[in-house]
């Protein structure tokens, strides 16, 4: 299965590694030298989590990002799914 949050749709992003040497001028240094940029990936912090749905009387397993899990713990699963225009039936 893909490395993707099933609720928010967050997935791996791509960017650059930027190596920096030296002290910046505003911090009292001569200058800061930036080396060769190389490609890198930013992976999503995914967690396999089991949620109990009292309306259905059963549990569902969802792969969620840590950020989404924080929001779910604050406002609840039903409210978070409604906010992201998802339905519980999609995860059964």
From Swiss-Prot:
Cell cycle found in the keyword field: no
Keyword Metal-binding: no
Superkingdom per UniProt: Bacteria
GO process annotations (BP): translation
Record-level GO cellular component terms: ribonucleoprotein complex; ribosome
Keyword terms, alphabetized: Ribonucleoprotein, Ribosomal protein
Gene Ontology MF annotations: structural constituent of ribosome
Family: Belongs to the bacterial ribosomal protein bL28 family.
Protein's recorded name: Large ribosomal subunit protein bL28
Organism of derivation: Borreliella afzelii (strain PKo) (Borrelia afzelii)
Gene: rpmB
């Amino acid at each position: 299965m893909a490395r993707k949050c099933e609720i928010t749709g967050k997935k791996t992003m791509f960017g650059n590694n930027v190596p920096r040497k030296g002290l910046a001028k505003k911090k009292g240094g001569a200058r800061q030298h930036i080396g060769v940029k190389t490609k890198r990936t930013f992976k999503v912090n995914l967690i396999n989590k089991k949620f109990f749905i009292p309306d259905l009387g059963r549990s569902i397993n969802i792969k969620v990002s840590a950020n989404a899990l924080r929001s779910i713990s604050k406002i609840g699963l039903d409210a978070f799914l409604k906010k992201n225009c998802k339905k519980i039936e999609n995860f059964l």
